[in-house]
Amino acid sequence: MGAAAAEADRTLFVGNLETKVTEELLFELFHQAGPVIKVKIPKDKDGKLKQFAFVNFKHEVSVPYAMNLLNGIKLFGRPIKIQFRSGSSHASQDASVSYPQHHVGNLSPTSTSPNSYERTVGNVSPTAQMVQRSFSSPEDYQRQAVMNSVFRQMSYAGKFGSPHADQLGFSPSAQPHGHTFNQSSSSQWRQDALSSQRKRQNSHPYLADRHYSREQRYSDHGSDYHYRGSREDFYYDDRNHDGWSHDYDNRRDSSRGGKWPSSRH
């Protein structure tokens, strides 16, 4: 297999894009299916972005997985249409392999119209139908996890000046309400655990002055002091150090050869 054929096998064609869709947004979306090397939206002779893109994955196995997971997801109200790239060995299998479309509610599984795609990234509204619907299969949970992950990543981007997060129209209330987080009970649990831990430490003759939990070490600094060495800080440092990049090897694997970025205290 030649290099060109191998690259075609690792590439997807993504069509029916809304004009506001960017390479950055597609990168974040398709990265949920596997490591992405680059995303390219071609331009016409006038310099305007065309309504399709090519997504090149690092691993060939990510291609059919992304096709199955993301085909038909709406970006800014328009469902994307994913196809194998011309020349790909997967294209010959496309006619014989049926990739199931994902539907919600009472939609007919045989419907192929764009309106049948209910999995959305843009313009999510907290309707009663969305909030009350039940997830009937592990695939539904997986798709919801993809949407939540993209929402979190684009929220980080919007927090630091990217215009894409606000335009997407995400609503946290569109996430499934079957799993609720009780903040008061969690806070009480942490207080009880901390109290128990202090009792154990005070009873040990060698740990009284040396070992403290993270909560104890930073509680003395007052409520305005925040622990900065969290994974979110590492995520932000990695994602925003040099701005947006479509090079997976330089952007995603750089931390493997070295150590975690040091915390800025």
From Swiss-Prot:
Entry GO terms, CC: nucleoplasm; nucleus
InterPro entries recorded: NEXT_complex_subunit, Nucleotide-bd_a/b_plait_sf, RBD_domain_sf, RBM7_RRM, RRM_dom
PROSITE patterns in alphabetical order: RRM
Listed Polar residues bias regions: 107-125, 170-196
GO molecular function: 14-3-3 protein binding; RNA binding
Swiss-Prot/TrEMBL keywords: Acetylation, Meiosis, Methylation, Nucleus, Phosphoprotein, RNA-binding
Keyword Nucleus: yes
Region described as ZCCHC8 binding: 25-35, 59-76
Modification type N-acetylglycine: residues: G2
Pfam families in the record: RRM_1
Keyword Cell membrane: no
Residue numbers of Omega-N-methylarginine PTMs: R152
Domain RRM, chain residue ranges per copy: 10-87
Modified residues annotated as Phosphoserine in this record: S136, S137, S203
PANTHER family, per database record: RNA BINDING MOTIF RBM PROTEIN -RELATED, RNA-BINDING PROTEIN 7
Function noted in UniProt: RNA-binding subunit of the trimeric nuclear exosome targeting (NEXT) complex, a complex that functions as an RNA exosome cofactor that directs a subset of non-coding short-lived RNAs for exosomal degradation. NEXT is involved in surveillance and turnover of aberrant transcripts and non-coding RNAs. Binds preferentially polyuridine sequences and associates with newly synthesized RNAs, including pre-mRNAs and short-lived exosome substrates such as promoter upstream transcripts (PROMPTs), enhancer RNAs (eRNAs), and 3'-extended products from small nuclear RNAs (snRNAs).
Subunit structure, interactors included: Component of the nuclear exosome targeting (NEXT) complex composed of MTREX, ZCCHC8, and RBM7 that directs a subset of non-coding short-lived RNAs for exosomal degradation. Interacts with ZCCHC8 and SF3B2/SAP145. Binds to MTREX through ZCCHC8. Interacts with YWHAE and YWHAZ; these interactions are stress-dependent and RBM7 phosphorylation dependent; release RNA from the NEXT complex and may affect RNA targeting to the nuclear RNA exosomome for degradation.
Comment, domains: The RRM domain mediates RNA binding; the RNA must have four nucleotides for efficient binding. Mediates the interaction of NEXT complex with promoter upstream transcripts (PROMPTs) and potentially aberrant forms of other non coding RNAs, such as snRNAs. The RRM domain exhibits specificity for polyuridine sequences.
Protein name: RNA-binding protein 7
Source species of the chain: Mus musculus
